[in-house]
Each structure stands twice: as C-alpha cells, then as structure tokens.
Design a protein with these regions (language model features):
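Radical SAM/AdoMet-radical enzyme domain recognition
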Residues: 1-87
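Auxiliary Fe-S-binding modules of radical SAM enzymes
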Residues: 71, 78-79, 89-227
Length: 227
C-alpha cells in the first residue's frame, strides 16, 4: 500500500523489480480478504510501478473465497506490462485443511472469459513460473503450480525467513539458523555463513509431500515464515 509514495526513493536506492500480492480486483472482496479497504491504493501502486520497473502481481486463489478473481486479475496485463502470476495454495500452517484450487482450473476460468492463452515463447526465468500470453496483451500471465505441477527436480530455491533461518523447502519444518552468525562480529563470519548455506543445500529434500498432508511437518503460516 505504501509503494506509490516511496517508489522514487526505492528506485534511487537500487530497487530493480517488485512483487505485489493482490488476490482480487473487487473492492469488497479485497476488504474481506485483507481486513482493509485499501484496494485503490494498491492499484495506484501497480499502475505507477508498472511504468518504471518490472512488476509481478501474485495471486493465490482460494476455494470459496476468490474463485472468480483470475480473469479480472489477468485483464490487468492487457494494458499494463506486468506479469500476473497465480500461485497454488500450499497446504501449510492454517492452510493445511484448505482445498487447493489447481492452476489448470484457474487457466480454464481465464480462457473461458478472455480467450486462448498461448505458451510464452520467450526463455524461462530461473524460477518455477510458467508463462502464457493472451492475444493483444501488453503483459503475461504466469502459473506457479506448487502442488499439482511438482517442479522439485529443478527447484533452486532457499528461503531466508523473517527470523533469520534458511528453509530448504516450504513443505517441511527443517531450517538452518543464520541469525546469530549475521549478528556476530567474528572475522570468520563469511566462511561460517557459507557453511550454513551449503548445509541447507545438502538437506534440501528430493520432493515435497503436499499430496500426502499427514507427512507435512511445517506448521507455521506463510505470514510467520516470511522471506
């Protein structure tokens, strides 16, 4: 919400891209999801940022909450050069008992209202998103199918949490502490950090277990994990 008023300062500080979480373009729905009537401020930030740097808009579709949101959100990419990405709900924390909406269903809802979305011919980035283009659109739509499109074999991610820990995988509770080293003034700090990073890479699991929820060991919510 504060991006618009701070954008110039962030650009001067070196910001070269931004991700914005937005689960709906409907004002009442936005207020129900976030508890705040601030959709217009968020949209103002999207429009302003889209003219100055690469923007990714991230949406999580929840069954019974915002199932009608994908097409209006995708439509933002018609006139704005943004990537609108749909991320499957990962069943961790409070979401463990929620039903994930498959991205195949999300794509179907978009194509039903807007038209065929062709695979983007451009090179894939280093992340898990798969992009498509809608005819006449300035931007793209993307899909991160964390549950139904398992991409663990090519995952190159570690997550630095809000409490200074490295998580190899969001599905499991395993984490490697970094905070005490970061706050330490020892001369060998850099080497110790490197060792912890390598440890996190070594314990990275071969695959998540979102299809067998009893095996999920991460009980914290995404808002607490951060990163």
């Amino acid at each position: 919400m504060l991006l618009a008023e701070h954008l110039d300062g962030l650009l001067e500080a070196g910001l070269d891209a931004v991700n914005i979480s937005l689960d709906t373009t409907d004002r009442e729905q936005y207020q129900a999801i976030t508890g705040m009537d601030e959709l217009e401020r968020v949209m103002a930030s999207v429009r302003l940022a889209a003219g100055k740097l690469p923007v990714k808009i991230n949406c999580v579709v929840q069954r019974g909450v915002n199932e009608d949101a994908p097409a209006p959100l995708a439509a933002l990419a018609r006139d704005l050069p943004v990537d609108v990405r749909f991320i499957e709900l990962m069943p961790i924390g409070a979401a463990k008992d929620m039903q994930t909406v498959p991205n195949a269903e999300v794509l179907g809802r978009i194509e039903e209202r807007i038209g065929k979305a062709e695979e983007d011919p451009g090179p894939r980035g280093s992340g898990p998103a798969v992009y498509r283009r809608l005819k006449g659109f300035s931007g793209r739509i993307g899909f991160i199918s964390a549950v139904h499109g398992q991409f663990c074999g090519t995952c190159n991610r570690l997550r630095l949490t809000s409490t200074g820990e490295l998580k190899p995988c969001l599905c499991y509770g395993d984490r490697v502490p970094l905070r005490e080293i970061l706050r330490d003034g020892a001369e060998d700090k850099a080497e110790r950090i490197r060792e912890r990073i390598l440890e996190a890479v070594r314990i990275k699991p071969a695959a998540h277990c979102f299809d067998d929820r009893e095996k999920i060991t991460e009980n914290r919510e995404m808002a607490r994990i951060g990163g």
